[in-house]
């Protein structure tokens, strides 16, 4: 059986990347929450 997770950089960036997050108000909320928490990586 084929494994379910077959990583690819482009689709990952397109859905979870920093620029995508910044597009919407809720995405910016995510980034700000991660900043406040002190995350090293804000987005993928």
Curated annotation (Swiss-Prot):
Keywords: Ribonucleoprotein, Ribosomal protein. GO terms for molecular function: structural constituent of ribosome. Pfam families: Ribosomal_L34. InterPro entries: Ribosomal_bL34, Ribosomal_bL34_CS. GO terms for biological process: translation. It comes from the Bacteria. One of its GO terms (cellular component) is ribosome. The keyword Disulfide bond does not apply. The keyword Ribonucleoprotein applies. Belongs to the bacterial ribosomal protein bL34 family. HAMAP family: Ribosomal_bL34. This is Large ribosomal subunit protein bL34. It comes from Campylobacter lari (strain RM2100 / D67 / ATCC BAA-1060).
């Amino acid at each position: 059986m084929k494994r379910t997770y077959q990583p690819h950089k482009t689709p990952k960036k397109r859905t979870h990347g920093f620029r995508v997050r910044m597009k919407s108000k809720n995405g910016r909320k995510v980034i700000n929450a991660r900043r406040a928490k002190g995350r090293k990586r804000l987005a993928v």
